[in-house]
A protein has these predicted regions:
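N-terminal Rossmann NAD(P)H-binding glycine-rich loop of SDR-like oxidoreductase domains
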Residues: 14-34
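NAD(P)H-binding glycine-rich loop region in Rossmannoid oxidoreductase-like domains
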Residues: 62-96, 107, 124-127
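Glycine-rich NAD(P)-binding loop of the Rossmann-fold in SDR/ketoreductase-type enzymes
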Residues: 63, 92-103, 143, 147-148, ...
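Conserved Rossmann-fold NAD(P)-dependent oxidoreductase catalytic core, especially the SDR/UDP-sugar
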Residues: 99, 103-145, 159, 167
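Glycine-rich "substrate-gating" loop/helix at the edge of Rossmann-like oxidoreductase active sites
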Residues: 142, 172-180, 200-212, 226
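Conserved beta-loop-beta element that borders a ligand/cofactor-binding pocket
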Residues: 153-177
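Alpha-helical substrate-binding/gating segment
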Residues: 187-196, 206-231
Length: 231
C-alpha cells in the first residue's frame, strides 16, 4: 500500500508556493500526513480550516524579493507551484512565472536550500506532433504561458549547473479535491443526473493526472537520492 511504499521520512521544512491553490492544498495535506513542516506562500488567503493551524501560512507575492527572501530563511525544500495561468494577461504570466521563479531560485540558492522542486507543465511541449512525449523532446512553448514555462525551466537549469538540486516535473492537467472551475461543474451535473455537453464525437482522448499521484511524485523528488531526482 501507499503507506509502506512512501514511509514517513525525516521531518523537513517545506515551502509551498501557491499553497492556497489546488495542488498546494492537496500537497499540504499530503506532507502533514507524512509529519512534515509546511510553510505556504500565496498571494491569496489560505482558507482551509483543516490545515490552517498546522502550517505557517504567509500571504505574499513571489514577485516581491523582500517577502521571498524572508520566507526562504528556514526552508529545506521548496515546491514551486505558484503560477499565473493561461487566462491571465501576458505581462502577468511572465512577471509571475518567470520573474517570480527567478526570485525564488536566487533566494533558495543564497540560503542553501537542499532542493527546489519546480512544477512546470506539459505546456512546454506545445502542440505535439508525436506520442508518447519524452522528457528530452524539444520544447516549444505555445502562447505566453507555454513560453514562460519554458523560460522558467531554463532558469532552473542555470541554478542546477551551479550545484543546486532542482527536480522539474511537467504534469498534465490534474484532478482531485479542491479542483475548481469547469471540472467541478461537470462532476456536479453528473452527480445530479443532469445532462452536460460533450465536445465533438465524444471519443477524443484527453490525459488527466490524479493530484494524489502528483503529490507522490513530488514526495519522491524530495526524498530519493539527488542522483535520481536532479533532472
Amino acid at each position: 500500500g501507499t503507506s509502506n511504499r512512501y514511509a514517513t521520512a525525516v521531518r523537513k521544512s517545506f515551502l509551498i508556493t501557491g499553497g492556497a491553490g489546488c495542488l498546494g492544498i492537496n500537497l499540504t495535506r499530503f506532507l502533514l500526513a507524512k509529519g512534515q513542516s509546511v510553510t505556504s506562500l500565496d498571494i491569496s488567503e489560505l482558507d482551509y480550516a483543516d490545515v490552517r493551524d498546522q502550517i505557517n501560512a504567509i500571504r505574499g507575492d513571489i514577485r516581491d524579493t523582500t517577502t521571498v527572501d524572508a520566507v526562504m530563511r528556514e526552508v529545506q525544500i521548496v515546491v514551486h507551484t505558484a503560477a499565473a495561468l493561461p487566462l491571465y494577461e501576458p505581462h502577468e504570466i511572465f512577471s509571475t512565472d518567470v520573474d517570480g521563479a527567478r526570485n525564488l531560485l536566487k533566494a533558495a540558492y543564497s540560503h542553501g536550500v537542499e532542493r527546489f522542486i519546480h512544477i512546470s507543465s506539459s505546456a512546454v511541449y506545445g502542440i505535439p506532433d508525436h506520442h508518447p512525449l519524452l522528457e528530452d523532446d524539444q520544447l516549444y512553448g505555445v502562447g505566453p504561458y507555454g513560453q514562460a514555462k519554458v523560460e522558467a525551466e531554463g532558469l532552473c537549469e542555470e541554478y542546477r549547473a551551479q550545484g543546486m538540486c532542482v527536480p522539474i516535473l511537467r504534469p498534465k492537467s490534474f484532478l482531485g479535491p479542491e479542483r475548481l472551475g469547469i471540472f467541478a461543474m461537470l462532476y456536479e451535473w453528473a452527480k445530479d443526473g443532469k445532462n452536460f455537453p460533450v465536445l465533438g464525437p465524444g471519443d477524443q482522448p484527453y490525459q488527466f493526472l490524479d493530484v494524489e499521484d502528483l503529490c507522490e511524485a513530488i514526495w519522491l523528488c524530495a526524498t530519493l537520492s539527488q542522483s535520481v531526482t536532479n533532472d
